[in-house]
Amino acid sequence: MSDKCGHCDCADKSQCVKKGTSYGVVIVDAEKSHFEMAEEVGYEENDGKCKCTTGCSCAGCNCGK
C-alpha cells in the first residue's frame, strides 16, 4: 500500500477529503416528494483504520494490512 489513505481524494494536497459512493433516493408521494441522500464511505483499502493528516498521508494505521 502507498503512503496515501485510500479513502482520501488527494488531487488537492491542501485538503484531505473523504471519498465515498453516494446514492440518491427519490420518494414520491401523492401529495409531496422529497430527495434523500445517503453516503457510503469506502474503507476497503485500509480496513477503516487509517486517519488522514492534512498532507493526506496515512497516520497511525496499517493501511491494507
Swiss-Prot record:
Metal-binding found in the keyword field: yes
Keyword check for Metal-binding: yes
Top-level taxon in the UniProt lineage: Eukaryota
Any GO MF annotation of the entry: copper ion binding
Keywords: Metal-binding, Metal-thiolate cluster
InterPro entries for this protein: MT3 (IPR044671)
Gene Ontology BP term (one): intracellular copper ion homeostasis
Function statement: Metallothioneins have a high content of cysteine residues that bind various heavy metals.
Similarity comment: Belongs to the metallothionein superfamily. Type 15 family.
Protein name: Metallothionein-like protein 3B
Species: Oryza sativa subsp. indica (Rice)
Phylogenetic classification of the source organism: Eukaryota, Viridiplantae, Streptophyta, Embryophyta, Tracheophyta
